């Protein structure tokens, strides 16, 4: 792996609003960042194998998508304008029963292609046939936290535990350390207490985290309250789930006590504003969570409920949503939205070596081309990234010290083949008996 020197870019480190070098340099040695600073700050003796001219670009950490279902790209536009439970029970779950492992592989490849082209370098995924998901991640060069979704009721409950355990043991730390394997109990309403306790015991024994949907809809709140007399957050806390590293997706319907628990237990939260809006699930109390010190990142959710995987759009939607819903134009300002999409997302995933541009961090970064009419004039770079930038502005993507996209060309994936396979398999899937 050749050392890389990036020169001339405006470097946005994400260590704070003032962490900006207008004529900056980034030295990458192997898969890590060696130095970041103004031009001329590269350590003496550093010999790059290649140099990248960043003139007119902003260099920044790659986006961290904290919650998605990668292979659901195959179901993009298949089921729209429906409430969550009807969407799941009538459209999504029936067609998912017909998915084959190779469908999931190609759906994940399409996901990785789309995410790379829009500047995402790390994502968290929950699905099934996770060995094929991991294979796609390994091939794409991306970084990912992967979990096999587990339904704790019905005939497949035991199989989900067995497959999850096998996956964690085989893939945790895989793909040169780019894959983190987790356990994925689906949600409080699909996982009874005794099942959750089994998952917690396994995760603790294996040293793995947990990825779970939490308090996504009012139906879930009512169901858990009717069955257990409590909230989904308290239900999970009583089962011992929050004693482990946890990524909780959605967290829409929370009371003050729930927020206190999530913050105190250092639960990572994946805020998915566009999916929540589209399914009319509600608006997560993100400003309250942030004020309580919770670790909040952004996620797109799956392409079947978003309908894209564009973190630039997700940032903009998040910031605007919380301004209009609170009546406060200062709610979720641009730097906070950008932090949630980068360093905050890494923190929510428990990844300590991504999300910032500083020495010792993994070399996961992107170059955004600011030589665009919609990014001119450049009074505030951070505001531009959140309110004006588009995915097509992402010029270069580097993951783990390897250039995976340059001048909008993804170097290690066959774009045409991936799209053709995905289109073919998606049509077969929805017509398959």
Swiss-Prot record:
Substrate binds at residues 96, 148, 158, 186, 216, 301. It is an enzyme of class 3 (hydrolase). Belongs to the metallo-dependent hydrolases superfamily. MTA/SAH deaminase family. Its cofactor is Zn(2+). Zn(2+) binds at residues 67, 69, 213, 301. Catalyzes the deamination of 5-methylthioadenosine and S-adenosyl-L-homocysteine into 5-methylthioinosine and S-inosyl-L-homocysteine, respectively. Is also able to deaminate adenosine. CDD domains: ATZ_TRZ_like. It comes from Pelotomaculum thermopropionicum (strain DSM 13744 / JCM 10971 / SI). Pfam families: Amidohydro_1 (PF01979). It comes from the Bacteria. Its EC number is 3.5.4.28, 3.5.4.31. One of its GO terms (molecular function) is S-adenosylhomocysteine deaminase activity. SUPFAM superfamilies: Composite domain of metallo-dependent hydrolases (SSF51338), Metallo-dependent hydrolases (SSF51556). It catalyses: S-adenosyl-L-homocysteine + H2O + H(+) = S-inosyl-L-homocysteine + NH4(+); S-methyl-5'-thioadenosine + H2O + H(+) = S-methyl-5'-thioinosine + NH4(+). Binds 1 zinc ion per subunit. This is 5-methylthioadenosine/S-adenosylhomocysteine deaminase. PANTHER family: AMIDOHYDROLASE-RELATED DOMAIN-CONTAINING PROTEIN (PTHR43794:SF11), AMINOHYDROLASE SSNA-RELATED (PTHR43794). HAMAP family: MTA_SAH_deamin. InterPro entries: Amidohydro-rel, Deaminase_MtaD/DadD, Metal-dep_hydrolase_composite, Metal_Hydrolase, MTA/SAH_deaminase. Transmembrane segments: none annotated. Keywords: Hydrolase, Metal-binding, Zinc.
